[in-house]
Swiss-Prot record:
This is Chaperonin GroEL 2. Belongs to the chaperonin (HSP60) family. Keywords: ATP-binding, Chaperone, Cytoplasm, Isomerase, Nucleotide-binding. ATP binds at T30, L31, G32, P33, K51, D87, G88, T89, T90, T91, G415, D496. Its main location: cytoplasm. Its EC number is 5.6.1.7. It comes from Chelativorans sp. (strain BNC1). The keyword Cytoplasm applies.
Amino acid sequence: MAAKDVKFHSDARERMLRGVDVLANAVKVTLGPKGRNVVIDKSFGAPRITKDGVTVAKEIELEDKFENMGAQMVREVASKTNDAAGDGTTTATVLTQAIVKEGAKAVASGMNPMDLKRGIDKAVEAIVEELKKNARKVTKNDEIAQVGTISANGDQEIGRFLAQAMEKVGNEGVITVEEAKTAETELEVVEGMQFDRGYLSPYFITNQEKMRVELDEPYLLIHEKKLASLQPLLPVLEAVVQSGKPLLIIAEDVEGEALATLVVNKLRGGLKVAAVKAPGFGDRRKAMLQDIAILTGGTAISEDLGIKLENVTLEMLGRAKKVVIEKENTTIVDGAGSKDEIQGRVNQIKAQIEETTSDYDREKLQERLAKLAGGVAVIRVGGATEVEVKERKDRVDDAMHATRAAVEEGLLPGGGVALLRAAKALDNVTGENEDQKVGISIVRRAIEAPIRQIAENAGAEGSIIVGRVREKPDFGYGWNAQTGEYGDLYQMGVIDPVKVVRAALQDAASVAGLLITTEAMVADRPKKETAPAMPAGAGMDF
């Protein structure tokens, strides 16, 4: 086992603090509407320019192992806030730095770190309650657009697109962000359920011009296994022919005799039919077929249920208003499933999202949720160069999460003002001893850090701004860094989602508390590079 370096007490905290400062100083220049850009060198390709705090944080790796530990802990704050709220990463970093700095001073002067942490936790709890109490609910489309615009650093086009997307697909719908092939940014909305499987044979096409299959008011046969022979299918095909409606078959695969017969029937005009492969793989495929069955009011035919294909009746088939099948995807519009059953399935998927620990699983579950609940909106981000597109895409991602968070928990005045105002909640919080009281006052000072940093990035003096804002007791009154004016921030459209501010403060306090209570640090010793031995026969004697 390699030898380790161990640092104790103030030496450990000092090294750690240096790492915290390096990372936080690089991230905090991006805060606010007049935040600066950070250029990141890439091992291949052009450098990346970004104003996204978490992107900067993820790129920083320090040579000194102990300093790096401090930096990585702050990076963890940025990542956690990003996961929870999708925005507010820079605010969280600024708050962490402020709490750790003050906390380290208090510990160095002989205070009990555990009591300091208890004081910090009490203060944070009180502030979070105050923030929730003063939240405004989001009702109008304009407000959603404003949140998006602010999070996208004042880009109104992004705010507008996000508001439109949320209006179309609802709060549960999925909004995906892609890079456009052109310089224009555009929005495309897919209503209904779409999955990434196309028609199994081009002979099924009904609309030659658009090269796609269009089925009006079809029946849907949802089958878990492969269909190869025709015999089991005959009873259901005959029933569908008599009803005069089209039929869509969704199965693991349709091949051989079954596929050939379906194609011949379609070409002769006896039966309007199409077949697609089932989406997903393994257990996920089963779940998705069940989703389609619930959405269309049908039954997923599987051997687990003991239903044989020969015994399937029309009542077991799903119904939809329309189905459109293209080469690579299928869209089911307006399924005939009952609202209650769909809602029950939605709640079930939400519970799974809460429980899962895997990011990949969570993403897939959210996709399923969206397909059931509303639809999918795709924002294609355009730009003149690849660097610009990537930078804009970062901002659209941030803005999208911020608008979601705003709809979920409501809005607060932005620009760091909400935290500053919430400090009055600390007047009623008392510590059990002197050290806890110091912990509370550390938070009181730290929550000024975001507004000071926003002012500094905009070229103003933080202390003067804080003083002027405090003069007026109105919760929404503050300073607009974009215009340099004072006034009602709600009216000016300078707003932050409660969830973002809350997550930033809670995550910052959590990690800062851990850093303050650290007494020892252990890291691998740097390996000494030994010179390679001289190869045999390379001596100097002839």
